[in-house]
A protein has these predicted regions:
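Short amphipathic alpha-helical interface segments
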Residues: 1-37
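Short, amphipathic alpha-helical interaction segments positioned at domain boundaries
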Residues: 7-8, 56-65
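Short alpha-helical interface patches
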Residues: 24, 28, 44, 58-59
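A short, conserved structural fragment
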Residues: 40-50
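Short, Lys/Arg-rich nucleic-acid/phosphate-binding segment
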Residues: 49-53, 57
Length: 65
């Protein structure tokens, strides 16, 4: 679980202020399969055509700084 929390922090850094960055999205997709599945299951990430995207409205709601 601690590894998953650390990866949430990485995602938070990549998508800071809710701005989606295509280059950073590629880095997010490098997470191991189990972590991506867990994030998708938590509805923080959505997976489309093998690419991983942040569910920005949920991100903005949960992680507003």
């Amino acid at each position: 679980m601690n590894i998953l929390i650390n990866k949430f922090k990485v995602i938070r850094y990549f998508i800071k202020n809710g701005i989606f960055n295509e280059e950073k999205a590629i880095e997010i997709s490098k997470f191991d399969h189990n972590t991506i599945d867990a994030l998708v299951h938590s509805q923080l990430l959505v997976q489309v055509d093998g690419r991983v995207y942040l569910d920005k409205p949920l991100y903005d709601y949960r992680y507003k700084e």
